[in-house]
A protein has these predicted regions:
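Metallocofactor- and cofactor-centric catalytic cores in central/energy metabolism, strongly enriched
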Residues: 1-220, 224-236, 252-256, 356-442
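Conserved anion/nucleotide-ligand pocket segment
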Residues: 242-244, 248-319
Length: 442
């Protein structure tokens, strides 16, 4: 075991959530209930997973907190921004994800979380009509206002560290523009020039967080920190960044099942995925421009796992789209289901001598129940990374994300294979804990 330089998790950790809707309030309520011994944080890797450290006779399995100094749940303080002014208790009741009996025991704590005014541009989420919005004339004013929010929250709550995580709606798609998004100076100039076409509000949150010494996590598929200018800022401020898009339901299944097809050397003709979802996220994604952003995130999973150029007999012939497998993703807004998302996958595969077979997957899940532990894990592990001196893209957090960040300017591919991602996660924890990384089967 090596000596590590990870700083201890002393003092309070402020978790500032962009968005105070279903996901955020389910996360907050679960943490509060767990702290009181009234619930268990099931689904959280940081609270339940055990990693093998050492080999042979020295082998043992330990919780993350026994390997690295994680922040304690008792030390977490929540803050939030939202376009709607309702406090976290009111928002949790409105979302109807959790039963009233699971919210009321921590009503007093939830009521104290009153969302700050959001940095918002309705053109980026046309289906939202909240009025709890900052009056900013330019994108740079948004940045300055958000920076002040972070400073004030940190001081007022006596926090020693802050992490900012996006749990708000999906913005419209913003194509990466080399003239704006590749260099920090150009990004800052565009913010100051109020370039609303190329500078999304989410970029203002990320810029504000990083410049205030807080890691930033993008939980939606927005174009935000997955641009070279933000990587430059993360390097400059020595802050971790992670993204993008929480991997909760259908894509989690896809990233776990696609490797089975690939490992078994089966062929793929097509994969059709569709969902019904009735919460506010579904409402926003019912807008075509916003769905386009999400579609890109959900489609990106297969192409790095089942590669046509590596196995042309199984997955197609290079760039010839007529012979590649067909991959389609759809999300349908269906209010009666609220947060209880349902996903269907039809997978057309083929085996020995080309004979066809099918796989059908029907996942009836609860969107926010699956997302809440991801917020806990991503915030705690990003805080850990910052204290360990890790900055820039945190690839070891790919396990939790649909479209993991990677340096596409250098031809790097994202790692989407769930099992490879899990190895990356475990090895990062091992290394930060002073143990040797390895890829042995546990």
């Amino acid at each position: 075991m090596k000596q590590t330089n990870v700083k201890p998790a002393d003092g309070k950790l402020g978790i500032m959530v962009v968005g105070c809707g279903a996901v955020a309030t389910t996360f907050m309520t679960g943490v509060f209930m767990t702290r009181r011994g009234l619930a268990k944080p099931i689904g959280s890797m940081t609270q339940y997973d055990k990693i093998r450290v050492g080999r042979g006779e020295d082998k043992k399995y330990l919780h993350y907190k026994d390997i690295v100094p994680l922040a304690k749940l008792d030390d977490i303080v929540f803050g939030s921004w939202d376009v709607y002014p309702q406090n976290a208790y009111q928002a949790a009741m409105y979302a109807e994800v959790l039963k009233e009996k699971d919210i009321n025991p921590v009503k007093d704590e939830l009521e104290k979380i009153k969302p700050m005014k959001a940095a918002f541009d309705k053109n980026y989420a046309k289906r939202l009509d909240g009025d709890n919005v900052k009056d900013c004339k330019t994108r740079w004013e948004m940045v300055e206002a958000l920076r002040k929010d972070i400073r004030d929250f940190k001081e007022q709550n006596g926090c020693s560290r802050i992490v900012v995580i996006w749990a708000a709606s999906t913005e419209i798609y913003v194509p990466v523009d080399e003239k704006i998004h590749y260099h920090l100076a150009d990004l800052e100039a565009a913010m100051k020039a109020d370039d609303r076409e190329h500078i999304a509000p989410s970029m203002c949150y990320a810029y504000a967080a990083l410049t205030e010494g807080a890691p930033f996590i993008m939980g939606a598929p927005n174009t935000t920190v997955d641009i070279p200018a933000m990587w430059e800022l993360a390097e400059k401020t020595k802050m971790p960044i992670a993204g993008k898009d929480f991997k909760t339901g259908q894509t989690l299944v896809k990233s776990g099942f696609a490797p089975i097809i690939g490992t078994r050397c089966l062929g793929l003709h097509g994969w059709f995925s569709t969902n019904i979802l009735g919460n506010r996220d579904g409402l926003v994604l019912d807008e075509p421009a916003n769905f386009h952003t999400k579609e890109g995130s959900k489609l990106s999973t297969l192409e790095t796992i089942l590669k046509p150029d590596v196995q042309p007999d199984l997955y197609g012939h290079g760039n010839d789209e007529d012979t590649q497998y067909y991959h389609k993703v759809r999300i349908n807004y269906y209010p009666p289901r609220n947060d209880n998302k349902e996903g269907w996958d039809n997978i057309d595969i083929f085996g020995w001598m080309g004979y066809p077979m099918q796989v059908k997957i029907n996942f009836l899940c609860r969107d926010s129940i699956l997302a809440a532990p991801l917020l806990l894990d991503l915030t705690l592990l990003s805080d850990l990374a910052a204290r360990a001196g890790r900055y820039g893209i945190q690839r070891f957090l790919s396990f939790f994300l649909k479209a993991p960040m990677h340096d596409y300017t250098q031809g790097e591919e994202a790692v989407n294979n769930l099992y490879q991602q899990y190895t990356m996660l475990k090895n990062a924890i091992r290394e930060m804990g002073g143990y040797e990384a390895d890829e042995e089967i546990d």
